């Protein structure tokens, strides 16, 4: 099973991290607050983009459902 990474993004640094992980054998989930933020991210095979503001309950739900190996906070 591939490692699961959740990157909480919305910054240019987050987009750079996403590009850096393009060739890794991981399942990468990226959450951004807006559709505009999602549009700035280039598609890649191992990437799922979620465009919505996540409150604590939604974050907990995501963690329980996907069980990420690693969480990266690349927000402001």
Positions of predicted regions on the chain:
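A short, flexible N-terminal coil/short beta segment enriched in small residues
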Residues: 1-27
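Eukaryote-specific long, low-complexity intrinsically disordered regions
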Residues: 4, 39-41
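Short, flexible loop segments at the rims of nucleotide/cofactor-binding pockets, characterized by
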Residues: 6-7, 47-52, 76
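Structural motif
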Residues: 8, 31, 73-74
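Short, structured coil segments at secondary-structure junctions
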Residues: 24, 42-45
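Short, polar loop motifs at secondary-structure junctions
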Residues: 32-38
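Glycine-rich, highly charged phosphate/nucleotide-binding loops
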Residues: 44-64
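Glycine/small-residue-rich loop that forms an oxyanion/phosphate-binding "nest" at active or ligand-binding sites
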Residues: 60-76
């Amino acid at each position: 099973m591939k490692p699961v990474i959740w990157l909480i993004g919305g910054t240019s640094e987050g987009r750079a991290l996403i590009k850096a992980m393009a060739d890794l054998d991981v399942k990468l989930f990226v959450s951004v607050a807006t559709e505009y933020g999602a549009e700035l991210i280039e598609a890649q095979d191992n990437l799922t983009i979620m465009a919505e503001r996540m409150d604590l309950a939604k974050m907990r739900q995501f963690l329980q459902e996907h069980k990420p190996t690693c969480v990266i906070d690349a927000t402001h």
